[in-house]
Swiss-Prot record:
Protein function: May play a key role in alkaline pH tolerance.
Composition bias, Low complexity: 27-38
Cross-referenced Pfam families: Asp23 (PF03780)
Protein name: Alkaline shock protein 23
InterPro entries, per the entry: Asp23
Family: Belongs to the asp23 family.
Region (Disordered): 1-40, 144-166
Disulfide bonds, paired cysteine numbers: none
Amino acid sequence: MAVDNNKAKQAYDNQTGVNEQERKEQQQAQNNQPQFENKLTFSDEVVEKIAGIAAREVKGILDMKGGFTDSFTNAFSNGNNVTTGVSVEVGEKQAAVDLKVILEYGESAPKIFRKVTDLVKEQVKYITGLEVVEVNMQVDDVMTKKEWQQKNEKDNKENNEREGLK
């Protein structure tokens, strides 16, 4: 009976092209070949830009506020740097985001924080595939929309005057 089973198996293998020994040899040959590894990486600046754009989309965020180097950089640019007020740490699969913001007076900081956190995580994950494991938001100032607009107009006027001097 065992002989019949072997004949049946051999007939099946012949019909389907399955050969156990051949399969093992192919697998061993594949294991001996050098394996190529594909890798997709993102610079910190890319993740900063994504997080900055996402945070600015949330109602109640008037602006992002940078430190001294951002202020210095904005003095020599048009001031539309979307990475201002954003810093990140990017690993191979995860990222952490720190934001410095100016909130609109009368808006709920905890609600805005939840919305910003959700949107930043969603956008970074969608665009890069990176999991955002931490979002920290520091409120550096609170302004009314009118105060913020006046400050922006003043800053734009100063930038335009500086541009005229170049």
